[in-house]
Every structure is written in structure tokens, then in C-alpha cells.
Amino acid sequence: MAKKTKRALAIREKLEAGKVYTALEALQLLKEMPAAKFVESVDVAINLGVDPRKSDQVVRGAAVLPHGTGKTVRVAVFAQNDNADAAKAAGADIVGMEELADEIKAGRSDFDVVIAEPAAMRVVGQLGQILGPRGLMPNPKVGTVTADIKAAVENAKAGQVRFRADKSGIVHAMIGKIDFDAEKLLENLHALIAEINKLRPTTIKGVYMQKAYISTTMGPGIAVDVASLTNA
């Protein structure tokens, strides 16, 4: 407990109370903070001016980060024939149809992303109660139900992050690991923000991106100037 307290105090000393940092300043500051005993993820939380209870204000999508997430992603694909071959060639870890569905029903869970060709949804649809709670149910809005299986697998392997505003209108996403250069983390952040901006609902009034915070897995959230989130 003493070590945790010492680290927490050291982190607190580096933060200026009430200060709002630029995105790059926040990322550089995170890298200067005392390290945890593992390579922490760098995460962003963005408060959006949306009401997710309204169907036309649901913000959900995916972004391919130029420098990846630093995480090895295992991809399962539901496809047949040419699409199954394309999935394997693109690096999918698991490819199948009914037999894969049976394995998942029996408890198989060694995958991080599930992708399906449209025709496979008749099979995948049976897995809603298993994949849904884990956030793994394929969905065309995030590119995981698609005819272009090759691109979907390549994107997932390259470090695509999926996001959705929660019931409070907050988007949480990982933009890399703390051992990334600050500039690479910033470029990943810009890619994420660009996708979130594309999904701005036409029905909302007022400010879309209201507040933003950047943090590591075990660190505090650092308030970030929303204007610094884009590379415009």
C-alpha cells in the first residue's frame, strides 16, 4: 500500500490543480509520471453533448489507429468459401461457420473481435446472448458485418478501436500504450477524434465535444482542452 501511495503522491505533484492541458501536453505529462509495474494503456474519455436514449443520437463507430493499440488482437471470422479464404490470408485466427458457433456456445472465447460476412448472420444471430454482453456481436455500423472480409480483418489486426457513447454520453477508447512516443499517441488520438466527429448527429444542439480526459490504466484523468483534440 505504501508504494501505491508514494506513486500517487508523485503523480499528484506533477499535476497543476484546475489546469486544462493540450492533448500533447497531457500525453507528455503521462509519460513523465512514475511507471506502474506493467505497460499501461493510454485511454481517452470524451463527454459528448448527446442523449443516447434517443435513437438518432447514438454515437457508435470504429477508428483505425495509424500506430495501432500495442495490443495483439485475436480475430474470429464467420465466413465461407472465398471469404473464408480471404479471412485466413488476411491473418484471421479463427474461421468457421456452424462449427465455430457450436464451439462458442460450448464456451470458446479466445478471441477479441468477431467479424461476419452478411450471409453468416443467420448463424451468428444465435450467439447474441453470448457475444452481446461482451461487446463482440458483429455490427455493420462498426464494420464487423461486411462483404469486404479482407479489409475488416486487416483493420482489426492493425489496431482498430470500436467505440460507443455510453448512457451518460461518454465515449471511452484506448489510443495506445504508455511506451508509445507522445507524438504517435497524439496521431492515434487525432484519428479517433476524426471518426467521432464524422458521426456527429444532425439533431443535436449546442457543443458536441464538451469535455475530454486522458489517463493511463492506473493513473488519474488529465483534463484536456477539447480544441486541441483535432489536428486541424
UniProtKB/Swiss-Prot annotation:
One GO BP annotation of this record: translation
GO cellular component: cytosolic large ribosomal subunit
UniProtKB keywords: Repressor, Ribonucleoprotein, Ribosomal protein, RNA-binding, rRNA-binding, Translation regulation, tRNA-binding
Single GO molecular function: tRNA binding
Gene3D superfamilies the record matches: 3.30.190.20, 3.40.50.790
Alphabetical list of SUPFAM superfamilies matching this protein: Ribosomal protein L1 (SSF56808)
Keyword Transmembrane: no
Keyword Transcription in record: no
Pfam families: Ribosomal_L1
PROSITE patterns assigned: RIBOSOMAL_L1
TM ranges: none
Record CDD domains: Ribosomal_L1
UniProt subunit comment: Part of the 50S ribosomal subunit.
Homology family: Belongs to the universal ribosomal protein uL1 family.
Cited function: Binds directly to 23S rRNA. The L1 stalk is quite mobile in the ribosome, and is involved in E site tRNA release. Protein L1 is also a translational repressor protein, it controls the translation of the L11 operon by binding to its mRNA.
Protein's UniProt name: Large ribosomal subunit protein uL1
